[in-house]
């Protein structure tokens, strides 16, 4: 991490059941004014139900209110259609397609 960079996260519950995590890492309020986002829903049967989309919308709003950042970035593999769909549905735009360790990947951003 850069000096002054932070991380912040929350657990995701569906009913009373812990089903995943969402977090921002590398939160930089000084230089780049940005953070990076990660989210995981553990149980495949809960994918596609809007749970991750709602958690992402709520969490991003909270991060923009809590931290002095202008954008949030996210990486995903180009073959991960669900992740790309989630990010685009919640306001992220594709910025760059690149190859990492032989795998096509995508970088997306959402601006304040």
Predicted regions and their residues:
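Active-site rim helix/loop that mediates acceptor-substrate recognition in acyltransferases
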Residues: 1-7
């Amino acid at each position: 991490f850069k000096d002054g960079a932070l991380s912040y996260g929350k657990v995701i519950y569906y009913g009373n059941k812990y089903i995943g995590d969402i977090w921002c890492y590398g939160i930089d309020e000084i230089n780049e004014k940005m953070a990076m986002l990660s989210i995981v829903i553990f149980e495949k049967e809960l994918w596609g139900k809007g749970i991750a989309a709602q958690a992402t919308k709520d969490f991003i709003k909270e991060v923009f209110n809590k931290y002095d950042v202008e954008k949030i970035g996210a990486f995903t593999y180009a073959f991960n259609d669900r992740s790309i769909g989630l990010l685009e549905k919640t306001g992220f735009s594709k910025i760059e397609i690149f190859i990492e360790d032989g795998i096509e990947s995508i970088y997306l951003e959402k601006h304040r």
